[in-house]
From Swiss-Prot:
Transmembrane segments: none annotated. InterPro entries: 3-IsopropMal_deHydase_lsu, Acnase/IPM_dHydase_lsu_aba_1/3, Acoase/IPM_deHydtase_lsu_aba, Aconitase_4Fe-4S_BS, Aconitase_4Fe-4S_dom, IPM_dehydratase_rel_enz, IPMI_cat. The keyword Cell membrane does not apply. Its EC number is 4.2.1.33. This is 3-isopropylmalate dehydratase large subunit. Pfam families: Aconitase (PF00330). Catalyzes the isomerization between 2-isopropylmalate and 3-isopropylmalate, via the formation of 2-isopropylmaleate. The keyword Iron-sulfur applies. The lineage of its organism: Bacteria, Pseudomonadati, Pseudomonadota, Betaproteobacteria, Burkholderiales. It comes from the Bacteria.
Amino acid sequence: MGRTLYDKIWDEHVVHTEEDGTSILYIDRHLVHEVTSPQAFEGLREAGRKVWRISSIVATADHNTPTTGWELGYDGITDLVSKEQITTLDANIKEFGAAAFFPFMSKRQGIVHVIGPENGATLPGMTVVCGDSHTSTHGAFGALAHGIGTSEVEHVMATQTLLAKKAKNMLIKVEGAVTKGVTAKDIVLAIIGKIGTAGGTGYTIEFAGSAIRALSMEGRMTVCNMAIEGGARAGLVAVDAKTIEYLKGRLLAPGTDSVTGKFVGGPEWDMAARYWATLHSDADATFDAVVELDASQILPQVSWGTSPEMVLSIEDRVPDPEKEKDANKRGAIERALTYMGLEPGKALNDLYIDKVFIGSCTNSRIEDMREAAAVVKHIGQKVAKNVKLAMVVPGSGLVKEQAEREGLDKIFIAAGFEWREPGCSMCLAMNADRLEPGERCASTSNRNFEGRQGAGGRTHLVSPAMAAAAAVHGHFVDIRKFV
């Protein structure tokens, strides 16, 4: 019987399996940041242990890093707890070591799920873990990647393994071509809207179909990033020519000259590429669940509530809880409407916003910057007067550098956007970038829970194009009219 992509990677990394199904899984790559690592390093220190395989660790600071004030250096980190976590990471990596460390303000520093792939730390067929739930992002490369807790971070550091039980296989096929203006973010929001935030619970999802294959690697990362929001611990996309081409010349990838940083190929690259090409589900592989979507029917999406599954197309209206027969769902809708300050039946394109955030590990790569800048340039207007703040936060120093080479920063700044330094920023209320109570935000991030972007803040999840258009109009609009 054929095997799924998930089966193949799992089978190659299982060290031992108990009768109850609990397995010891070997971990290839461990991504580390400043929030979930301090306790793990301290645990190693107290036990007198060393990191088992230093070459597996790639570290950066991202959650707490400020996106302004870099001219002040570490003194620009105004929150003392944030500063302590960042300096503690510096000290821990100095003591324990890492294959690569991109500290605060370094050229390659950025969001861990952006810097991993762009530096070649994420390779097809790997098992990848990080103390962050959106580690599923790396599944775009045909890698088995998922988040782990702080105690597991220590366990992986000490043993290079993880205790896990194998999940079931789910296939989500998105066939056909999307219409103009519909992006990877819209595809994954539509998927979550269909299966719900618990639909993928107990599964590893493989995203497939012509619409997924048509996506760039950046787009595939966006889709896999939000697999966790659909309830799955991990999401995968099969390796193809786009995957392999993307990896050429990446800092830590095989075939890259360590001095020039350029792709030179060679036997190691050839062997790796041949293996990577096998990383797809067999034609006769069976899945425990299959979900299908027609890409042509997916419209630009906007979340309206306090869960990613509370999402509608821009043509829709805010739902009426009275029309929901299920009492639990009706109650959830009512609570969401109250928190979000919305009334049933209100058109989504009538929602005025206070702030705009373009960034996060979901949408802060160069393709996202280009997408948003193109919309701003095409519309040719400045940020609307009712919008208090519109900020663009590149996902890494390399993304920022590339965007500035292309002049994208000038487009944003001329239109009244703030062009920031890289970091997690307003995705979560853990740094200086946050919403005030009652403020409504068009955000390209991945979570719209109560208080996610700041106590009392109201988050609407959208694509970079939708966020950019909302910034200059002051409210949500159908992006298809402007592309």
